[in-house]
Design a protein with these regions (language model features):
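Expand to "…catalyze enediolate/carbanion chemistry for C-C bond making/breaking, isomerization
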Residues: 1-79
Length: 79
């Protein structure tokens, strides 16, 4: 089961979502998250911090985390 995290409300509840029994993966919808957070770019520090929080919640709860990235170098930035 994949939980798609793509808005500020989901970010606010990320630890509770990651703790749900049966969730296998947190998938970051970075562009939707960017819009929801009122940022102009997915590279905005607010969005970068949000993605880091999602990754940390995934690690803390033993969940995989996924996100589309344009290159493998970009993926290495997050994972």
């Amino acid at each position: 089961l994949v939980a798609q995290i793509e808005d500020a409300e989901a970010l606010d509840e990320i630890d509770a979502i990651a703790a749900v029994d049966g969730i296998d993966c947190l998938f970051v919808g970075r562009m939707d998250l960017t819009v929801s957070l009122g940022a102009a770019s997915p590279d905005d520090p607010v969005v970068v911090d949000a993605v880091r929080r999602i990754c940390a919640a995934g690690r803390a709860h033993g969940r995989a985390v996924g996100m589309f990235t344009p290159t493998t170098d970009e993926a290495g930035r997050w994972f």
